[in-house]
């Protein structure tokens, strides 16, 4: 059997993955808070850990892997959105969940085995909080229930590599007066009449964010499971607090044995933000005509533990590559299994960049069947994602010859105005202009519009 190695954030080492039960490999991924469209950064862990799901299914069997990814549908951000819009909370969350599934489906992500909504697991959350209180790991104060960090100093901070004392010393937030320790965090909080709430032993209220994932993963996967994944921005406090809650409520269990965290995403070398004007939702890109398969390809070109930079150039190059690969694999059956080199790359801590490099080798060798099998393993080249590439291609040879002749003439006359005019027009039409001593190549980008070339005729 293939040996999978994963970088475990908890031990800070690459370890051989050994499942608790090879006949039921289990993974949990923290999902979105559903109040708005998923942005490009939200999509990265979905795509990355979709590849992990596919790899585990490849190695252990399609029916032997359980994947849970939650929806946080009770949160103050959702409450704020409802108040601002005048819409019902349930209407907003249901709509946003549907958006999320459609957008991630467009990126080729398989649906998880379980997609629990936090609001469906309130009784389990209350039961876990009661267990924590009974074990002296939590206390009630002014309608709130808080986790007592001092009750588990030996374990708290191991994932993020912080000590409780250092965290307290570095805290810059105002501490609620009812907390015994500044690092204590909320398990349950009271709800006003106009806020979502559920009856509990501590009055009407709602759960804190961290207890939601602990309760859902415990109910679906048990007190010990294999892999927990998420963005590295969740390592502290969310994942640290999950570990504390779960291990203290179920001391006989291990909770998650392997922790995987993906790095963050940038756009054109800068942090994505609305103030910089480089903030994109997945739907924004899809509506711009960038195929979901192209977005996925760009994601997979960077190892999940490295920062990823989304650029228009990468998207254009990805589209050109996928067009060539789809032409090579059209009308043929995939090989019986993906090439060993591709599987080995993925098995080495999800080295998707290495897998893509191996796929380039298969394409260069003309091995369409092998390329197709590898593509299906990483979620590329499937029929369901190929409609964009089936659009009739445009013969650009006349335009390439025209620009080449214009450049040759300009070299003689030193007047490059016509060359510049043509280049600007081709760029405006969504073509990437590649010029060399031997010729000109026009490569359609994601936003290519053939109609804009008519003005040059």
UniProtKB/Swiss-Prot annotation:
Similarity comment text for this entry? Belongs to the class-I aminoacyl-tRNA synthetase family.
Work out whether the entry's keyword set contains Protein biosynthesis. Answer: yes
**Which EC class does it fall in?**
ligase
Segments carrying motif 'KMSKS' region: 271-275
Lineage, please?
A: Bacteria, Pseudomonadati, Pseudomonadota, Alphaproteobacteria, Rhodobacterales
This protein's cofactor list reads:
Zn(2+)
Subcellular location as annotated:
Cytoplasm
Subunit structure and binding partners: Monomer.
Organism, scientific name: Ruegeria sp. (strain TM1040) (Silicibacter sp.)
Residues involved in ATP binding: 274
GO BP annotations listed: cysteinyl-tRNA aminoacylation
How does the cofactor attach, per the note? Binds 1 zinc ion per subunit.
HAMAP family for this protein? Cys_tRNA_synth
SMART domains per UniProt: DALR_2 (SM00840)
Which Pfam family would be a valid example here? CysS_C
Show the GO cellular component annotation of the record.
Answer: cytosol
Q: What domain of life?
A: Bacteria
**Name recorded for this polypeptide:** Cysteine--tRNA ligase
Motif 'HIGH' region positions after renumbering to this chain: 32-42
């Amino acid at each position: 059997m293939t040996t999978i190695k994963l970088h475990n954030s908890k031990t800070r080492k690459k370890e051989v993955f050994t499942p608790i039960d090879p006949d039921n490999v289990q993974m949990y991924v923290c999902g979105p808070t559903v109040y708005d469209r998923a942005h490009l950064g939200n999509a990265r862990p979905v795509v990355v850990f979709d590849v992990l799901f596919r790899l585990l299914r490849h190695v252990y069997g399609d029916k032997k892997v359980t994947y849970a990814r939650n929806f946080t549908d009770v949160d103050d951000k959702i409450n704020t959105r409802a108040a601002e819009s005048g819409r019902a909370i349930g209407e907003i969350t249901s709509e946003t969940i549907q958006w999320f599934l459609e957008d991630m489906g467009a990126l080729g992500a398989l649906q998880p085995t379980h997609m629990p909504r936090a609001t469906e697991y309130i009784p389990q959350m209350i039961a876990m909080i009661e267990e924590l209180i009974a074990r002296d790991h939590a206390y009630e104060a002014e309608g709130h229930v808080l986790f007592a960090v001092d009750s588990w100093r030996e374990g708290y901070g191991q994932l993020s590599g912080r000590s409780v004392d250092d965290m307290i010393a570095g805290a810059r937030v105002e501490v609620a007066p009812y907390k015994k320790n500044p690092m204590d965090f909320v398990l349950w909080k009271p709800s006003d009449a106009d806020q979502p709430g559920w009856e509990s032993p501590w009055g009407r209220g709602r759960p804190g964010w961290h207890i939601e994932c602990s309760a859902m993963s415990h109910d679906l996967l048990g007190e010990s499971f294999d892999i927990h994944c998420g963005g590295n921005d969740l390592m502290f406090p969310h994942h640290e607090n999950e570990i504390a809650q779960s291990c203290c409520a179920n001391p006989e269990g291990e909770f998650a044995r392997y922790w995987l965290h993906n790095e963050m995403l940038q756009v054109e070398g800068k942090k994505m933000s609305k103030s910089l004007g480089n903030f994109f939702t997945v739907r924004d890109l899809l509506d711009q005509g960038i195929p979901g398969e192209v977005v996925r390809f760009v994601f997979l070109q960077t190892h999940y533990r490295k920062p990823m930079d989304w650029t228009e150039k990468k998207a254009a190059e990805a589209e050109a590559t996928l067009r060539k690969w789809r032409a090579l694999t059209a009308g043929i059956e995939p090989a019986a299994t993906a090439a060993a080199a591709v599987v080995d790359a993925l098995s080495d801590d999800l080295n998707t960049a290495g897998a893509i490099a191996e796929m380039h080798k298969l394409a260069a060798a003309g091995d369409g069947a092998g390329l197709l099998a590898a593509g299906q393993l990483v979620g590329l080249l499937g029929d369901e994602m190929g409609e964009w590439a089936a659009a009739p291609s445009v013969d650009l040879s006349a335009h390439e010859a025209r620009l080449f002749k214009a450049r040759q003439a300009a070299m003689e006359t030193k007047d490059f105005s016509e060359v510049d005019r043509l280049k600007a027009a081709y760029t405006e039409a969504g073509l990437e202009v590649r010029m060399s001593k031997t010729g000109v190549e026009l490569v359609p980008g994601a936003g290519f519009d053939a109609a804009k070339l008519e003005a040059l005729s």
